[in-house]
Curated annotation (Swiss-Prot):
The keyword Repressor does not apply. One of its GO terms (cellular component) is cytosol. CDD domains: KH-I_PNPase, RNase_PH_PNPase_1, RNase_PH_PNPase_2. Its main location: cytoplasm. Gene3D superfamilies: GHMP Kinase, N-terminal domain, K Homology domain, type 1, Nucleic acid-binding proteins. Its EC number is 2.7.7.8. Its cofactor is Mg(2+). Residues 552-611 form the KH domain. NCBIfam families: polynuc_phos, PRK11824.1. This is Polyribonucleotide nucleotidyltransferase. Disulfide bonds: none annotated. Residues 621-691 form the S1 motif domain. It comes from Dictyoglomus thermophilum (strain ATCC 35947 / DSM 3960 / H-6-12).
Length: 693
């Protein structure tokens, strides 16, 4: 007999409802979560057997938006949702981040979490109910998980704090964060700010953590009533006999020498050679032991790293704990692109390239409404950047996530369309990777934007912070490299200007962070950011005064909205003529803004003049140089502006002489003559005159 239960709780002023046992009966665990009128179904399925010979926990999180949830029909020919969109991938990564560190370290069974958006009320975002639902479904499945966890979105508008603010308020917020955690610590932080000071940022995290405690208690009440059976699994355990044998065969000093090798590639080779040596020696005795040897060597390397940091206060590359790697910057490295920069920090190297376009905003199909994107950042991580040979299969989730993070870091500095009417695309190519490539992309983007002449008011820099923790002892590491990321407990990416933070993302491998750790991390990151900004500002202190000669020219005109029809013309005749004659692209906004994109300044100016001619108001007394397009017995029809034709009656021709000697001028087809507007009748018909000219 299935147990069907429904639980309700007020959460941040709205009803949170969780239904258990109502749907998805074949899943290991499932929760139907409704917040406001936004509804998500979260399912968890765990395989019965552990995955052999893997040195990681095989967790997959999928977030799926059904467009019917927002009353939409998918675009395209098939009218059906396809592969995951960028927002879906970013939401999946967001949900994954606080879940992963809380699973038991000896749990190696495959787990798949699927979040399906069923209803969206255009007010309550789907991210918070998704994280809460995932936590609830996992604990009710009985999986070895140190939950439950809570999550809130917190916003600050400069005066007030908002817990789970409505989506409609997001554009007015100076700080917008998603924070997840347990009762005792913070697990995940992700969000953006408009140059928010560190003390405000920390205050927001503390308020968010306090607000989520109620929803954690709510899940504990549900758990106590349901009382699910624990999930039986075969734990991954290192064979103690093998461990002793390995550490007798390979000394701690050999492992220490390997991780203290200065170069990343040499360090990796030294560690891999050690592992191969051990596997070849013990495989005939113990059989397949690759995963176990990886675990043994990695745990010993982690112990050595912790000892060096916590006891000796130094790092494997000789740096102090709060020291950044050597930084170098170069701009204008590619001659025909619109802007470029090469940013290098230690062995991490990123090339960022800017392209300026017109009217090419990115439209994203999602249940959550979003404005077309004028600023786009793409991040590429080719295999050669880590010395590997792999097939290229398009951007992976990590690349999409890193690209979005670096995009958010620069977004508050991007000028409004009225100030700079270009669509801006930055592509960051990772040429060499030894940690913190996403933050190097932030720095490279900032440099390349200034090189392109994009009027950002100041530079943005980013740095990744790490953590070594044993019990209550901890040290925060500034500007972590790959080894410190792999063996450490935290990857806290923080980007911003001298005025404050613009974007953050926290990944952890420990059970959570205290406020003390977060506060120290923010302080060290600020110091490091200032050092990096010093170097960037010396390279290019402000945007170039002119954009690249190879970039398109854009002019913006403002016309009376009532004149849009005149500009377009019958069946688009007028606008087509401008485009064909000037080789430009023209975009007309309903409010009367006309965007002209041209290959050069001359074409832009010619198109602008034609737009002004088509939309100009004609008044009595105006004088034009017109062209005669038809001659009749009673006068001539003269085009005074494109599409604007008036009648010059023969009585209004210019005359010479007086009395019987008076003669009327001769006007022929094709003549260009100076003409004056004599009158305009109520129907808009124009009468012209040549007299008194």
């Amino acid at each position: 007999m299935r147990q069907v239960c429904s639980f309700k709780r007020e959460f941040a002023g709205k009803e949170l409802k969780i239904d258990i046992g109502k749907v998805a009966w074949q899943a290991t665990g499932a929760a139907l979560v409704q917040y406001g009128e936004t509804t998500v179904l979260v399912t968890v399925v765990a395989s019965e057997d552990k995955k052999e010979d893997v040195d990681f926990f095989p967790l997959t999180v999928e977030y799926v938006e059904r467009l019917y949830a927002a009353g939409k029909i998918p675009g395209g020919f098939f009218k059906r949702e396809g592969k995951p969109t960028e927002p879906e991938i970013l939401f999946a990564r967001l949900i994954d981040r606080p879940l992963r560190p809380l699973f038991a370290k000896d749990f190696r069974n495959e787990v798949q979490v699927i979040v399906t958006v069923l209803s969206y009320d255009h007010e309550n975002s789907t991210d918070i109910p998704s994280i809460i639902g995932a936590s609830c479904a996992i604990i009710l499945a009985g999986l070895p998980f140190k939950g439950p966890i809570g999550a809130v979105r917190i916003g600050w508008d400069g005066n007030e704090w908002y817990i789970n603010p409505p989506v409609t308020l997001s554009n007015s917020l100076l700080l917008d964060l998603v924070v997840a955690g347990t009762k005792d610590a913070v697990l995940m932080i992700e969000g953006d700010g408009k140059e928010v000071p560190e003390d405000i940022f920390l205050e927001g995290i503390i308020k968010a953590h306090s607000a989520m405690l109620d929803v954690i208690n709510f899940q504990e009440e549900i758990l106590s009533q349901i009382n699910p059976a624990p999930f039986n699994y075969d734990p991954f355990v290192v064979d103690e006999r093998l461990k002793r044998a390995v550490l007798d065969y390979v000394t701690v000093d050999q492992i220490r020498d390997a991780i203290f090798t200065p170069s990343k590639s040499e360090r990796q080779k030294a560690l891999e050679d050690l592992k191969k040596k051990v596997i070849e020696h013990f495989k005939p005795i113990y059989g397949e032991i690759t995963a176990q040897v990886d675990e043994i060597i990695n745990q010993e390397a982690k112990k050595i790293l912790s000892q060096v940091v916590l006891e000796e206060k130094r790092r494997v590359d000789g740096r102090k704990l709060n020291e950044i790697r050597p930084v170098s910057c170069e701009v204008g490295v590619l001659k025909r692109v619109h802007g470029s920069a090469l940013f290098q920090r230690g062995e991490t190297q990123v090339l960022s390239v800017v392209t300026l376009g017109a009217g090419e905003e990115q439209i994203i199909e999602s249940v959550i409404e979003s404005e077309p994107k004028r600023y786009i950042h793409h991040y590429n991580f080719p295999p050669f950047s880590v010395g590997e040979a792999k097939p290229l299969r398009g951007p992976k989730r990590r690349e999409i996530g890193h690209g979005a993070l670096a995009e958010r870091a620069l977004l508050p500095l991007i000028p409004k369309e009225e100030e700079f009417p270009y669509t801006i695309r930055v592509v960051s190519e990772v040429l060499s990777s030894n940690g913190s490539t996403s933050m190097a992309s932030v720095c490279g983007s900032s440099l390349s934007l200034m090189d392109a002449g994009v009027p950002i008011k100041t530079h943005v820099a980013g740095v990744a912070m790490g953590l070594i923790k044993e019990g209550d002892r901890f040290e925060v590491l500034t500007d972590i490299q790959g080894l410190e990321d792999a063996l450490g407990g935290m990857d806290f990416k923080i980007a911003g200007t001298r005025n404050g933070i613009t974007a953050v993302q926290l990944d952890i491998k420990v059970d959570g962070l205290s406020y003390e750790i977060i506060e120290r991390t923010l302080k060290q990151a600020k110091e490091a950011r200032y050092q990096i900004l010093d170097i960037m500002e010396k390279t290019i202190p402000q945007p170039r005064p002119e954009i690249s000669p190879y970039a398109p020219r854009i002019m913006v005109l403002e016309i009376n909205p009532s004149k849009i029809g005149d500009l377009i013309g019958p069946s688009g005749k007028n606008i087509k003529k401008i485009i064909e004659e000037t080789h430009t692209t023209i975009n007309i906004k309903p409010e009367g803004l006309v965007y002209i994109s041209a290959p050069d300044q001359e074409s832009a100016e010619k198109a602008a003049q034609m737009v002004q001619d088509y939309t100009r108001d004609i008044k009595e007394g105006d004088i034009f140089l017109g062209k005669v397009i038809r001659v009749t017995d009673y006068g001539a029809f003269v085009e005074i502006l494109p599409g604007k034709i008036g009648l010059l009656h023969i009585s209004k021709y210019k005359t010479t002489g007086t009395g019987k000697n008076q003669t009327r001028e001769e006007i022929n087809l094709g003549d260009e003559i100076l003409i004056k507007v004599d009158s305009i009748d109520s129907s808009g018909r124009i009468s012209l005159t040549r007299k008194d000219l």
